[in-house]
A protein has these predicted regions:
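Class I SAM-dependent methyltransferase SAM/SAH-binding core
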Residues: 42, 48-94
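A short SAM/SAH-binding and catalytic strip from SAM-dependent methyltransferases
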Residues: 104-117
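A short acidic, Gly/Pro-enriched loop at the edge of an enzyme's catalytic core
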Residues: 95-105
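A short glycine-rich, Lys/Arg-flanked "PGG" loop and its adjoining helix->strand segment in the class I
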Residues: 118-129
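Conserved class I S-adenosyl-L-methionine
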Residues: 1-36
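Conserved catalytic/acceptor-binding region of the Class I
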Residues: 128-159
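Nucleotide donor/acceptor-binding cores
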Residues: 38-39, 100
């Protein structure tokens, strides 16, 4: 199995247990990048959409590219009726965006799954002049009070 799809096999658990990002992070990004109506945004690998709502709610022209079929199904149920929402269920590495360019490309703990030359080379090509790449990462070592649970969590990460 492609290691990039490990969480797509457990989308409900991923959505339930995944650590969420702070609202302050998105407030800063929205303000700093000037995200709003008329701004073209691409999210790399949105998963279940934990970093989608604050950006999508600005009214920007939002596109997501998600490799996982299960994640894509969840995303379409959540956002498919939104006028400013576009989902591409494909591999960012090989997807042809044609002439489309973006003001902002962002990745919430996804870009590290891509080879560096592609991650940075392709995003640079897809950005409009003066565009911005924003990368968000989660940092920490979750320690459960239950050693058995912690061991089981580590098994998932080791896959």
């Amino acid at each position: 199995m492609d290691h990039r799809l490990c969480f797509d096999s457990i989308p409900d658990q991923f959505d339930k247990w995944r650590i969420h990002y702070s609202s302050e992070l998105f407030e800063y990004l929205i303000r700093y990048a000037g995200i709003g109506e008329g701004v073209k945004v691409l999210e790399l690998g949105p998963g279940t959409g934990q970093a989608t709502d604050p950006i999508l709610d600005t009214g920007c022209d939002y596109t997501a590219i998600e490799l996982g079929k299960n994640f894509s199904d969840i995303l379409m149920k959540k956002y498919g009726t939104r006028d400013n929402y576009n989902l591409i269920n494909d591999d960012f590495i090989i997807h042809d965006f044609g002439d489309e360019r973006f003001d902002l490309i962002y990745s919430a703990a996804t870009i590290q799954w891509l080879p560096e030359k592609i991650a940075f080379g392709k995003t640079f090509e897809l950005l409009k002049s003066g565009g911005m790449l924003a990368m968000m990462f989660l940092h920490g070592d979750y320690q459960s009070a239950d050693p058995e649970l912690y061991a089981d969590i580590q098994k998932v990460y080791d896959k």
